[in-house]
Amino acid sequence: MSSHHNDKATFLERLIFNNRPAVIVICLLVSIFLFWQATLIRPSTSFEKMIPLKHPFIEKMMEHRNDLANLGNTVRISVEAKDGDIFSKEYMETLRQINDEVFYISGVDRSGLKSLWSPSVRWTEVTEEGFAGGEVIPQSYNGSPQSLDQLRNNVLKSGQVGRLVANDFKSSIVDIPLLESYPDPQDQGKLLALDYRKFSHELEDKIRDKFEAQNPNVKIHIVGFAKKVGDLIDGLVMVVMFFGIAFVITLILLLWFTNCLRSTVAVLSTTLVAVIWQLGLMHFFGFGLDPYSMLVPFLIFAIGISHGVQKINGIALQSSEADNALTAARRTFRQLFLPGMIAILADAVGFITLLIIDIGVIRELAIGASIGVAVIVFTNLILLPVAISYVGISKRAIAKSKKDAHREHPFWRLLSKFASAKVAPVSILLALVAFGGGLWYSQNLKIGDLDQGAPELRPDSRYNKDNNFIISNYSTSSDVLVVMVKTKAEGCSRYEAMAPIDQLMWKMQNTEGVQSAISLVTVSKQMIKGMNEGNLKWETLSRNPDVLNNSIARADGLYNNNCSLAPVLVFLNDHKAETLDRAVHAVQDLSLIHISEPTRRRG
């Protein structure tokens, strides 16, 4: 190296290249440690991480979480009879076995488990002697034709058609509320967090696979947040496979671009080191892989390859004038380290801004991406030039790089004319027109999901097919808007509170995109009608406090312990942005009209 270049060498350059063996050894030791850490990282997420906890609606949900125990994280299993309907001995036996099997799966809130076999699912009717009722499946059920006829009558009188039983009577649902944490079977004093991947696999192995094989006339459909997240985590295997494909494609393209196997291997190796460091540091700092952060390694790989190619190209150009690979690597480091550092810092700032989004998985994605671009500084801006200073670049690659540097490509020559003095004003005008057009068209941009089901999964995925089945055959979907009507203690049964709830339900049931709505008013009207010999004229709210109090006695789960909160369950066709906007605006518009001191509506 000439004295001219020695004079330009910075302290950082001298520190790195005068201690190349130490740099290699340190990076090797760090890589071994972080590789071990990376092997320990596991898929991990939770219900709370997937939602914006500071959103006013979510804050109210968390505030009344104990009052809404069965309205949060739930899974629904629909058991379909392929031939015939549910009123057969074989089907009901399979449903009973599924109900029992689900009961013992870890993480299930067993007190809230509901199906036709649950004692809490009852029927009621009005007779000459008064009210009659009982369990939908009585203790005397034995699978005989007479028992099945009685079961059919009980289902029709239970009000569960469209809820637990499909509208066409060809399937029924097992409703499974989940616990975010549950006692360890081995140590009851210790709480275990719900493992979504394990839970999803148990549903597949113990429910779907087992009972579809046991009864060929049965088909299982499973929906719910936990199942969706489990399917997303299972996609990690596919992600790893695609990462391998991307690696091979990148290898081929780099070989074609550089004509040098040594430099190609160096770029790929240092970039893989960056990915390993990123995963290792994520585990070291206590993070896991969720359905979003599992995509960060792709991003780090792409950024690392981009910076690596710039380094290799620069070293190849310098190698045509330098005495050896070390000199070329030092000159390239001197020229490209600062621009590369600025580019990486810009990337990091962009990812850090995602931290303002108050959703756990998005924040972890931002942290993971920021860690990833930070390690690229060490692996691709420092380690790569040091590695190339040892292995060098082939003469073919140097000759090709020199030739490409002096060759004018027709396309780039044409493109450069847009920056000439004559054409530049036109270029600016076109850019302004494109900006204005984009700004105008962006007003039509939809916020939220545009399709039914889980947009994170393919439209033809098993989960989305199951979701479509339930939407098509039931009046209650997995997309539920819960409107919390809050009153003073023991006030939810007052006419002043129930009348606005009744109006809210009517408004929601006549809103596009709403399947149905249920509240304590639904039960109250049915009971008042029943107490008046089943006369439909009496299916309305009474102003008599004693009548209202008695009418909600069986409205289990539709008001809290001190009757200060009454949820209205609004079942939606889907969770598209338009559907949610219409439903929320309908609630808010009615709240502005009817809000009063004893009653408050909270989304």
Residue spans of the language-model regions?
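Signature of alpha-helical transmembrane segments and their immediate interfacial
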Residues: 2-45, 386, 400-451, 465-468
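Transmembrane alpha-helices and their membrane-interface boundaries in multi-pass membrane transporters
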Residues: 25, 284, 301-313, 337-356, ...
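Alpha-helical transmembrane segments of integral membrane proteins
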Residues: 27-34, 246-254, 270, 274, ...
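Juxtamembrane extramembrane loops of integral membrane proteins
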Residues: 46-108, 498
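Extracytoplasmic
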Residues: 93, 141-261, 272, 499, ...
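Hydrophobic transmembrane alpha-helices and their membrane-interface caps
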Residues: 263-311
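Helix-loop junctions and hydrophobic alpha-helical segments within the transmembrane domains
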Residues: 318-345
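Juxtamembrane segments of multi-pass membrane proteins
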Residues: 418, 422-542
